[in-house]
A protein has these predicted regions:
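Secretory targeting and sorting signals
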Residues: 1-27
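Low-complexity, intrinsically disordered short peptide segments enriched in small/polar/basic residues
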Residues: 4, 20, 31, 36-37, ...
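Intrinsically disordered, low-complexity regions enriched in Ser/Pro/Gly/Gln/His and often acidic
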Residues: 10, 14-15, 20, 49, ...
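Carbohydrate-active catalytic/glycan-binding domains of CAZyme proteins
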Residues: 28-329, 366-370
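Extracytoplasmic
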Residues: 312-436
Length: 436
């Protein structure tokens, strides 16, 4: 109500001295979000990828191509070629039954060999367990090691989704999930030290994260002084599948889960259905998504904002009220607003709010501004990016506390950038900025 009264009072006075010169309106520009590229347009779920000597290799859960389909490419973006079955003989005949060979992970060993960990159907129990195989080429053939699974806690529902992690000090581990979902129990993501090129276990199990829901497909990354544990959640069979993460200063925890998931169908504006099974490789992330009943493979650029991940094309939210304010103020208890606070009274010639945002690579992005406009006509803010005028943001009428979005194209540098909204036409409150 107070915001409406302010607008009415200013309109009644009609004194030019009370109003700043309006920003010259600029046409709303076409959205420039760059979404992950589809690089394998057929079933290729639960991907694992790495680069060696200028060639990229990728592996997937079993499909019509074989037990462990393998593909290669000259770059992460392709073109990708399916090369066949990396484990043509199938999983270990001593304990596994072919048909459910899931979530492969291949690691290039220092001695020039390669180790594959895989999930397979445990014949004796009907559960899934983790096996290991080795090869002298990334294309295979991988030959199973031993007549028993490497990890198989049947009392916990079995084990799936092993992924190799090598710490900065050279210590090698597997991160994996006990499949509690298969027996109606909670699931935990575990960390286990390995030896002999990852073919044997060398220590006990450390519990990382536990969930009564679905938590799977772990991928552990060390950035600076912190660890990031990526995982998938939600049902993998539809667009509700997602990728999130947790951080910790040490492998023993405590782990803090991100406030919002990193990648969802919604954060990609439905350009990917159920982004999950993520594999982070430096400044790239490989992820699968549903297309006409199959899970296709995508790749996206990743930036690391103070060692936190930013995926190009996936929306990242910055609360406007956490930015730098000049001659405007934060309004608390804003009904329906993100985090309950907004920036108000950007009403004067020297009023502005500025937020720092992170871009994984240099290029075009879409800036979505959450706003409410009760002025009675279209309002605007001037748009200044890294100190340079990039036009304006227009805000159609919504009414106060009715939060909507207005989107414009911006050009950003790789790394941190500043986005400043300045006084324009009429009056608008700003809830948040989302960069995509």
């Amino acid at each position: 109500m107070f915001r409406r009264l302010l607008v009415a009072a200013l309109a009644a006075l009609s004194l030019p001295a009370l109003l700043s010169a309006p920003v010259q309106a600029a046409p709303q520009r076409t959205a420039a979000a760059v979404f992950p590229a589809e690089i394998i347009g057929e079933d290729f779920p639960d991907p694992d990828a790495f680069e060696q000597n200028g060639t990229w290799y990728a592996y997937s859960t079993n499909n019509g191509r074989g037990h462990v389909p393998v593909a290669s490419a000259p770059s992460a973006s392709g073109p990708w070629t399916i090369r066949g079955d990396a484990m043509p003989g199938g999983p270990s005949a001593g304990w596994a039954q072919p048909g459910r060979t899931w979530a492969p992970d291949v690691y290039a060993n220092p001695d020039g060999t390669y180790t594959l960990t895989y999930t397979a159907w445990h014949k004796a129990s009907g559960r899934q367990c983790i096996g290991v195989a080795t090869a002298t080429s990334p294309l295979g053939p991988f030959n199973p090691v031993g007549s028993a699974p490497l990890i198989c806690p049947l009392d916990l529902g079995g084990a799936i989704d092993a992924n190799t992690f090598v710490a900065n000090d050279g210590t090698r581990y597997l991160v994996w999930k006990n499949d509690g979902n298969a027996i109606g129990q909670p699931s935990t993501l575990w960390l286990t030290r390995t030896a002999n090129n990852g073919t044997t276990l060398a220590g006990g199990n450390t519990a990382l994260l536990t969930s009564s829901g679905i938590i799977e497909a772990p991928d552990l990354v060390q950035r600076g002084s912190q660890y990031l544990l990526f995982f998938s959640g939600g049902g993998y069979t539809d667009c509700n599948y997602l990728t999130s993460y947790a951080t910790s200063p040490g492998l023993n925890g405590p782990w803090t889960t991100a406030f919002r998931p990193l990648m969802t169908t919604g954060t990609f504006d439905k350009h990917i259905c159920g982004p999950g099974g993520a594999d982070f490789v430096g400044d790239k992330v490989f992820v699968h998504g549903w297309v006409n009943g199959s899970r296709h493979l995508y790749v996206a650029d990743v930036g690391w904002a103070n060692d936190y991940p930013v995926v190009r094309g996936s929306r990242v939210r910055y609360e406007a009220e956490r930015g730098t304010l000049n001659h405007c103020q934060v309004r608390a208890n804003a009904a329906g607003a993100s985090d309950g606070k907004v920036v108000a009274y950007v009403d004067f010639a020297d009023s502005w709010v500025e937020n720092s945002v992170f871009a994984p690579v240099t290029g075009g992005y879409t800036l979505h501004v959450g706003y409410a406009n009760g002025s009675g006509a279209t309002a605007s803010h001037g748009l200044v990016v890294n100190g340079n005028n990039q036009g304006s943001v227009s805000y159609p009428v919504t009414g106060w506390d009715n939060w909507q979005q207005s989107s414009v194209q911006v050009t950003l540098n790789a790394g941190w950038n500043t986005i400043r909204l300045t006084k324009g036409d009429l009056y608008t409150e700003v809830d948040y900025l989302e960069l995509q």
